[in-house]
Regions:
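Catalytic cores of nucleic-acid ligases and guanylyltransferases
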Residues: 1-265
Length: 265
């Protein structure tokens, strides 16, 4: 790998610090895929996960497509995604591609789960380090390098106002948006920066608490709530909810739940 690519940790998003309307930012879909840094050197392409683990063999068709880019060397950042029957990015459907290790398993996963590499940044090209350039300039160069709607595509974005994109994500039950400062350089991780901020869609629904299960360690007294929902008048089990419960909430639940017990019959 090149000096820049060696041990590279991709730029990471902060979890707060941006608004949906900001003339200094552009807005992209928050993808439900897997982060991949791709390096092209001559006719060779190397793909790496965010943690540096090699991914070239897992997505060989993407590597082949990148090898055809009309430039001797380039370093790109993006996400590999697959789509469900409704055309939405699906991490669950992508999982077999991520976890397959043996050559036969990789081939089977490739045949059953087609993927696309959606590129949103260009870190280097033609022997030139581009990380110090403003994001909008890097994207301008990227759009000239990657064209069309094949296996490798540029992720679209909207400038100044991300509210319509956010509303679309919420309506379609997508992950949310990423708000990026137009003039920001590419800041190599692992430190998170408010130059890029995730704005996740909040989702809510009504459920009936059916009971709870014990946890482990500090959460031994209450690990998760068991919840259900009414479907055509019938109460159906929907699963467990445990994340997001603070210690204070758990204490309150343990105090109140016994008084709500009912006999099943």
């Amino acid at each position: 790998p090149s000096d820049l690519a060696q041990g590279l940790t991709p730029m990471l998003c902060a979890l707060e610090g941006a608004n949906l309307v900001d003339a200094e930012r552009l807005y992209e879909l928050k993808l439900d895929g897997v982060r991949i840094v791709a390096e092209k050197r001559g006719g060779q392409v190397a793909l790496r996960y965010r943690n540096g683990r090699a991914a070239t063999a897992s997505y060989a068709e993407v590597a082949r497509a990148l090898s055809l880019l009309p430039v001797d060397d380039a370093l790109l950042d993006g996400e590999i995604v697959t789509f469900d029957a409704e055309g939405k990015p699906s991490f669950e459907r992508l999982a077999p591609r991520i976890h397959a290790q043996r050559p036969l398993d990789i081939e089977l996963a490739r045949a059953n789960v087609p993927v696309v590499y959606l590129v949103f940044d260009l870190l280097a090209m033609g022997g030139r380090d581009l990380t110090g350039l403003p994001l909008v300039e890097r994207k301008r160069i990227l759009a000239q390098l990657v064209r069309g709607r094949g296996l490798v595509r540029v992720l679209d974005h909207i400038e100044d106002d991300g509210s319509l994109l956010y509303d679309f994500c919420k309506r379609e039950r997508l992950e949310g948006v990423v708000a990026k400062k137009k003039l920001s350089p590419y800041r190599v991780g692992p430190r998170r920066t408010t130059d890029w901020v995730k704005i996740k869609c909040e989702r809510d629904d009504d459920f009936v608490v059916l009971g709870y299960v014990e946890g482990i360690g500090a959460r031994k007294s209450l690990g998760a709530l068991c919840v259900g929902a009414y479907v055509q008048g019938q109460l159906q089990y929907r699963g467990r909810v445990g994340s997001g419960l603070s210690d204070a909430t758990i204490r309150l639940l343990l105090k109140e739940l016994p008084a709500l017990e009912q006999e099943l019959g």
